[in-house]
Amino acid sequence: MLLSLKWLREFVPFEGTAAELGDRLTMLGLELEEIIRPFDAIEPIVVGHVVSRERHPEADKLSVCKVDVGQGEPLDIVCGAPNVAAGQRVPVALVGTTMPGGMVIKKAKLRGQPSHGMICSERELGLGEDHDGIMVLPESFRIGARLVDELDLDREVCDIAITPNRADCLSVLGLAREVALAFGLPLTMPALDLKEEGADASNALRIDIPDASLCPLFHGRVLEGAAVRKSPAWMRYRLIAVGVRPISNIVDVTNYILMELGQPLHAYDLDLLAGGRIEVSAAREGERLTTLDGVERVLTSNDLLIRDGEKPVGLAGVMGGAETEISDKSSRVFLEAAVFRPGTIRKTARRLGLSSEASYRFERGVDQVVCTYAMNRAAQLIAGLSGATLRPGICHNEPLPWQAPVLRFRRARGEALLGISLDETFCRETLERLGCKVDAADAADWKVTAPSHRRDFEREADLIEEVARVRGMDTIEPVLPKVMRPLDRAGAPESKYSFWLRLKHWAAGLGLNEAINYSFVGQKDLDHLNLAVDGRIPIMNPLTADQNVLRTELAPGLLQNLRHNIAQGNAGLRLFEVAHIFEADATSDTTARERARLDILVYGSRYDSQWPHVEADADYADIKGIVEHCLAFLHLEGATFTLAASHPFLMPCVDVAVQGRQVGVIGRVRPEIADAYHARKDAWLADLDLDVLRELHDAARIAFRSLPVYPPVRRDITVAAPGSLQVGAVLDHILGLRLPLLCGVELIDVFEPEGKDERNLTFRMTFRHASRTLKDAEVDKERDKVAHSLVEKLPVRI
């Protein structure tokens, strides 16, 4: 937002410098990005007086002028402008001056006549587009004075970065409120003095709004007898200073009010509006409108359109239509002021790539209460600058009047959030200076009515933040956080985020690196993983086409991380992410459901290349071991791993269950999918349901068990099994025998002979007695029971 200090001082009596203003606003959260001096390039230009003008003896179109610039003898200047005449006050660039376009003025001879400077046009000075002749100045301008002083131009402009939640600051008025707040200054609004004449015009146009949510307010005023011409210099130069191109007095007023009050306006040629009505409604699919830039736009049902009785006349909140624009022939004007739904305007502007100063403000929300004041101020200016007659009455429709939210404010809550003591008087005065109405009938729980321009006031924390902002965030001393847990909460289940944090520490301690990805992904990312279309939640106003839906799995983000790391030359990757996934759920109050997930991705070299090791890549055993370690960390025993029939993007895929409840899956990313992410080796992924794991963890009871005193005895057994037999089936069978001395079984080796559809599986069994040392004979007897049972019950041989 470009803020002219001269313009600002019409609202608040601020006498400081631009730097002082920027420093204070920055501390209030409105960062000063740059101080611009828009007319620095014409600082050397002086006011001259044309003493005489003679025709050039060698060129009919040139004049030889003697120009007094207040430096003694008049200067000889050759000028080619047809409108130069003796007695004029004119802008003069002296020898040595660098013009805005980069040209340096030098002594020269033009057709034999010496010239010691240049008499300038508006375009040469960057003060307009007029280049038909020189710029003629008022006779009151002092000879030899600097042009910028005599024109009283806006010399300093602050470029203020406005955060998306502070739409109220996208105007001189909005920033003036902040300056008044920061420096304790009074705020003065421009006075209204409406001179209305003629018959009532409130019924000149009927305003129809079928859907109030799309347009809460639409009204306008009628002006007749307007003369469309160039705006006065003060308005043109002020608009130029803040980056707006002057067009004509009518259009310039609408832009002036937009920058001054933050309310976009639009002026129609009333004679070109047909049918005596205006309708604001959704466009029909495929409907067309030629906008002011001359481009024909094809509209969708998501666009908001303004129509007269016969045709579209404007793309609401974005740009007006070419058919009803103000031209030199216009004399009757309909001045529109309205409020539109921000999301609708944002979507249309993004889709069409048509961002304007108006749409930028409508997207963020405008002040519905100030809308009428802005329209009346614009009408007053148009009447004064064009000679128009303002008709009494307003064409008005407000189907959804503004309802000011009433929020609670508890000083004790503010002190708890900020960690500081808050003075009651300071809090009340701050809220009132912000424009709030404070009902302090309950001293501990105030009722605060938010002002219409602060659409970001939605909850108590917003008011507390404002109090802290005005007090000064830099005055709040940092303190170490205190974590207090009452004794009556001892043993209670930990919070979801505490559970997440413990898992993150576990994963980091295991050597995994945390990934944090956007919740937004592209439809094509989910399609690529063969994920179901049903249940996806689209984003209404996506930042990009690649982020137009909420993720239904964490895998897309991790696979993108994989692609990036491979591109950076990382040979081995160990990633994890703890986050939510989202699915549509018609039974939910919000029509959506969030689920917590822990995903782990391993890829490439098993060991760090800096350590001596046998070269090997991560495989199923690695990802399974990590999952088993996680379950052990959560004190969850008895996990089963069962081959899944199918999975959208994992093959093979194994279901992981604990106590009969599925807690996730592990498997290899399908090669064709991994290849699309530039993976040249197997990528293994685990997807665990944290909601289920947390429930199981909270229900788990840890019992004390003394450490074993007597040594274990181990026996290995190798079975030849068909390739279709799962290892889990063998393990489950051995453990299912419930041998009293058997305390553990693990797979230690797999051998697959060439040309045979079988594999040799070697298991290591651990035996132990709690109160004595085992003898070999009794251990061998237990092993024989296992061997006999395996041969009898399973298709294996020892």
UniProtKB/Swiss-Prot annotation:
Its EC number is 6.1.1.20. Keywords: Aminoacyl-tRNA synthetase, ATP-binding, Cytoplasm, Ligase, Magnesium, Metal-binding, Nucleotide-binding, Protein biosynthesis, RNA-binding, tRNA-binding. Its cofactor is Mg(2+). It catalyses: tRNA(Phe) + L-phenylalanine + ATP = L-phenylalanyl-tRNA(Phe) + AMP + diphosphate + H(+). Its main location: cytoplasm. Binds 2 magnesium ions per tetramer. SMART domains: B3_4, B5, FDX-ACB. GO terms for molecular function: ATP binding; magnesium ion binding; phenylalanine-tRNA ligase activity; tRNA binding. It comes from the Bacteria. Gene3D superfamilies: 3.30.56.10, Bira Bifunctional Protein, Domain 2, Ferrodoxin-fold anticodon-binding domain, Nucleic acid-binding proteins, Phenylalanyl-trna Synthetase, Chain B, domain 3. Mg(2+) binds at D456, D462, E465, E466. Residues 708-798 form the FDX-ACB domain. GO terms for biological process: phenylalanyl-tRNA aminoacylation. The keyword S-adenosyl-L-methionine does not apply. InterPro entries: aa-tRNA-synth_II/BPL/LPL, B3/B4_tRNA-bd, DNA-bd_dom_put_sf, Fdx_antiC-bd, Fdx_antiC-bd_sf, NA-bd_OB-fold, Phe-tRNA-ligase_IIc_bsu, Phe-tRNA-ligase_IIc_bsu_bact. It is an enzyme of class 6 (ligase). Residues 402-478 form the B5 domain. PANTHER family: PHENYLALANINE--TRNA LIGASE BETA SUBUNIT, PHENYLALANYL-TRNA SYNTHETASE BETA CHAIN AND LEUCINE-RICH REPEAT-CONTAINING PROTEIN 47. Tetramer of two alpha and two beta subunits. This is Phenylalanine--tRNA ligase beta subunit.
